[in-house]
Every structure is written in C-alpha cells, then in structure tokens.
Amino acid sequence: MILTVAPNVALDITYQVDQLIPGSNHRVRRVGERAGGKGVNVAGVLRALGHDTVVLGFVGGETAGAVTADLARGGLAHELIAVEGLTRRSIAVVDSSNGEATLFNEAGPHVPATRWDDLEARLAARLPRATALVVSGSLPPGTDDDACIRLVRLAAAHRVTVLVDTVGPALLQAAAAGADIVKPNAGELLDTTGVGDIAAAATELRRRGAKAVVVSLGAGGMAAFTPEGSWRAAPPTRLAGNPTGSGDAAAAALIAGAAAGAPWPDRLRDAVALSAAAVLQPTAGIVDLRDYRRFVPQILVEEHHASGLDR
C-alpha cells in the first residue's frame, strides 16, 4: 500500500476556454469538478496504476461533502479529518489555444496542532502495512513549522520510503529530515534554495539531507539527481492540453518505481511518460494508461554530468 498525505485538500474546478484574454469575458467550453489538491491527484494516478492507496488529510465546511463524495465515486479510500473552515477551491482556467493553465488557489482552512496530532496518529497506525508514503501539496494555515520533518521521520522510523512534493520552507524541512525523494519544479527549487543553477540547487538540497532530488522542467521533462547518478528525460514533443496534474502524475510514477526498486532511469522514464499522459486529460488526477504505454518507448533518458541545466 502507498499512503498519500494531502495536507491541503481542494475541490478542483477546471474551466476550458478558447483563449484566455485578461480583462475580457469568456465562454466556458467545458467545466470539470472533482476532489483535488496534489496529494489527492497523486492517489488517483496510483490507483489507476493498480496500487492500493489511502489519502490522509483535512476537510471542512460545505465543500467537504463534494470532496468526499467524489473520492467515493472514484473508489479512493481516505481518512479525512474534519476541521473548522471551508475546504479550499482550486480553479484552473485552461487556454485551449496554447494549452496553458492559469491557476487560482485558495489558502485553505486553518489546521490547529491538535488536528495534525490526529493525522500523525492515523498515519503511524497505517505505516507498518505501507510500502511508501507521498506527502504532496502546500501546507495549510496554522501548520507547525516542523510538520514536514515529523512526517518524514515518522516514515523513516517505519522504514517506509517517502517522497515529498511541496514548496518553500517545508521543502527545506523535508530535505533536512532526510526525505528519500523531494520533487520541486525548477522555479520552486531555485527560489527556495536561492541558487541560480538547477544542478547546483539540487546539490544543495542533497547536501541538506535529501537522498534524491527530482526536478520538473515543464515542457523540457525532468531531471533526477541521485546517489547513483544524474539523468534527464524529455518527452518526444510539446503536448497541448491541461498541464495542471502532470507533476502529480510524475510523483505517482516516481514513488511507484521506488516501491518496486526500479533503476533510476526507468523511474524517470515512467515519470515523464505518465506526466505526458496526464496533460492529455481535461482534469488533474486522471490518466489514460494507453497514452502512458504509448509514450514510454518515446522518452529519451540521458545521463548528464553538466554543471547546470536550463530552466
């Protein structure tokens, strides 16, 4: 079983428009609404890959019902802890003319320390039966500064591989706690470390304690910096579609590969292929495995020794 901690669950709303023009009116061609947030999206892709998974997180208010109902429809097991306030909405406006998505992310409800204690207790009860853990998404208001450290150390105490996909100080905390994999995108990595070069910034996170750093490069694919070496993988062509769930699909592939003990080049190839398959879907957290299998042999993985990478 692969567990996912989704600290900031969302109700994801996706609007598709012909072309996004700021300051003008738009006719929405398609609307999607589903349970989301990065951790939920990762869990959805893991389930599509055939893995048992449980989502742990927080929900509150009127939107909580829509979230839990959608999880039930999708067959996703969950332990969502009730908090005061309203589960946030995350709105993506996808421009069909170029495939770019503009995101509007609410902050989410305040989560007090007592609710975090509850989540950690539930996680600890499940970790003995788990093969891996993903902690994915932003941390909600009220979260203690060391929340990521506690989650990573809890997984380590049970010898469970952990991947963390978050930003800012929490990313540095995850690295310092010795996370097996951290997965920032290029901009997040550079901003968080204050280092101007991707390879050097990844090296800095590894110096702080992260065992491996996988960097999303957008349309350029992904790069992995690991104890076994460094590789870059790229999709065969730029894809038009909805990119909002591509990073979450990649995280699912990476943790599935880690749980299976796959070599790093294979993990990276699968991550880029699954990410590309996710772009073709209208909403995040969904993949068509036929697309994934079609992309796998097209992904070029190269070992690299360069001191830097372009964004």
Positions of PLM-derived features:
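Hydrophobic anchor at the start of a short beta-strand
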Residues: 2, 52-53, 78, 162, ...
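Short beta-strands and strand-loop turn motifs
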Residues: 103-105, 130-138, 165, 182-186
